[in-house]
Every structure is written in structure tokens, then in C-alpha cells.
Amino acid sequence: MKKKKIIITILVILAVGIIGYLFYTKHSKQVPVNIIRSSQKISIQDVKMFLKGFPSESASEDPRKYFSKDIVNLYTVRFFKFIQTQIEFTNKEEHLKAVKAYMYSILDPQKAAEMFALYEKFLDYETGIREQAKSWGQPKTADDLLRYLQSVQDYRREIFGIEVADAMWGAEVKAKEYTIRKNIIKVDPNLYGTEKEKRINDLKENMWGADAASIEDPPQSDPEKYASYQEKQALYQRDLQELPADQRLEKIKEFRKDYFSSDQIVRLEQVDEEVAAEKKKEGDYYAQEKAIMSNPGITDDKKAEAIRDLQDSAFGEEADAFRRRLNIQNNIK
């Protein structure tokens, strides 16, 4: 069962990679780098928090520790979102009344007054950005995504001012911009691995200068190592495609040595064998299904019966799951 889960995980990752490829390779002309200007000192540690996934505020946290100096920082929006989960919005007047009372209960009067005024503006911003976004349309390419990111931040600057908007959202925007630009490079089918790595390093230097090398920490956990291994394969996709099958396999083994222990490599090779066996099983099934469907001497009812028997024989206890997958695929078409 555990090995089947691993196989499913690998297939899901491959599917996500294909979707990412189709999406990002449609980008058109470039958008200038650094939506958040370099003069706005955004901590590289703050950006890394967003790259790893910035968690929502929990009820057990004391929000005062994030605003001991300034009320405007990357935790401000997080704090406002937390308030909205704790204080229901029946109507704006009652909501603001409750929010004001809460802020004055946890912050000193001056900070509470400033934070409440900022929250009122934040509510108006949320309404305004929803209306603005309707005119921008849904991003369809990587270039569209960058333009959308730029447009959203420009709107925030109009509402809050440049300094405040960049302080509140700057780290998040830089993390998103870097991720989009890196993916454009990563899935470019015309580039070899070494060129992709060079361009990504150039991107880091362009966005972070002397701190470029520290923007992405070496993987520590097994999921992080596996993600880095998958990324390495994506970077060297063209190289791998141009190699004969045996050399391609050897290259993949080299990549694995960079991230996994000997025991982990053995388990991955076992999974490789099982994935190959699953693919062969499905290939054999479809060949037999085709023979049944193209047999002019069998009625449609008999064909359906024969195919169901074939599925039961080929996939055993997994036959029902296979049929459900076929139904989903047929409904999508």
C-alpha cells in the first residue's frame, strides 16, 4: 500500500509538472525585473518565509510581539486576516466597532488608533481590488502573471502609499515574482541544464545582489530533498531527453546521489520498477482492449462484457479504481 502511495505521488508530481510546463511556456515579452524596487529594503529572511509558505496567524499567538516597533510590516496583513476570522462581519459598522475594541484591548492607545485607521483603509482596499481585478482579466501566461502582480501592487501603492504598501506586501511580491521568473527558466524546452542554472543564478543576483546565494536553503527534510531532485530533473530535461535510455538512467542515478542516502536510492529504484510495471500493465491492457473493440464479430454488449472481464483480470482489486479513472478522463474530454 505504501509503495502504491509513492507511485501515485510520483504520477501526481509528473502531472503537475506537465501543467506547469503548458502554463509557463506560453509567456510572451519580458516584464522588467524587481516589482519591489531595490531601495525598499526587504529582508531576505522575510522573502524566504513566503517561499516556504507563510503560515496564517493562530489564536495562540500574541500579535503584540510583531508590532513592538512599527505597526506596518509583513505581519500586518496576516494580523488583519486573523481578525476577520475571529470577528464576524454582519455589517461594516458593527464589525469595525468590535475590531476597534479588540485592538484597544491588546495595543497601547496610540498604536491601536493607528492600526485601526489602517484596518479601515484595508477593508476599503479589499473591496476596491476585487472590482479592479475584474478589468484585468485572468492571467493566462507567465507574462500575464507578472503584469497582474505589478498591477495589484501598483493599486496597493495608490491606496496606502508606496512605503506602506511595499512594507506590507513587499516580501510576498518578491517571493512570487522570483517563483514565476524561475519557473519560466526551469521549463524552457530550448535551454540545457547548465544554461538554466546560470540564468537562475543571474536572476537571484539581479533581485538580491550580495545575498543571492542565501535565498534558497539546501534541502533538509526528505520532502525538500525530493522536491530539489525533481527540480534538478526539470532543469536538465532537454539534456535527459537527448540521451539514450541507458545513459539517461545513469544521469538520473547521479542526480539521486546528490540528494538521497543509499537506502533511499534503493527504494526509489524499486519504485521505478513498479512504475514501469504499472505502465506495461496498462499498455498491455489497452492493446487487448483495442483488439476487442475492433473485432467485427462481437456485438457491443459482448464487447462491453469482455472489456470489463479484461479489466478485472488485468487490474484485480484495483479494477474499480481504474474504471473510475477512465470515467473521469472521459468526462473531461
Language model region names:
Residues 1-6:
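Short, low-complexity patches enriched in S/T/P/G
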Residues 8-21:
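Hydrophobic membrane-insertion alpha-helices, especially the h-region
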Residues 21-32:
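Hydrophobic single-pass membrane-insertion segments
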Residues 32-163, 167-175, 181, 199, ...:
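N-terminal Sec/ER secretory leader and immediately downstream segment
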Residues 86-92, 112, 188-194, 241-242, ...:
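Charged, low-complexity interaction regions
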Residues 118-139, 219-237, 295:
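Membrane-interacting alpha-helical segments
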Residues 144-291:
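Extended amphipathic alpha-helical interaction segments
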Residues 285-333:
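Hydrophilic extracytoplasmic domains
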